[in-house]
């Protein structure tokens, strides 16, 4: 069953099960163009910049492309030096998952 086909309570149960098994991880669901794997468990002590670096590698961006991450329902941009744990605590959804959308832009040429 796809993630968004589940009810909020089913998604929350799944997330709570993951958090119990991996208490030092942050569950995040990332959407955007050219991404095949959407759900990630991230270390709580990485910054948004480190996540963006990992994401760049996963989607194989060219050196001329920039990536932008938007978090939560309101699609907020956060400082790149902000810890993922802080973003999670501030913007996690009712199912305890942090949602993000990335956008890429040809900015360097």
What kind of feature is each model-predicted range?
Residues 1-109:
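Ubiquitin system architectures
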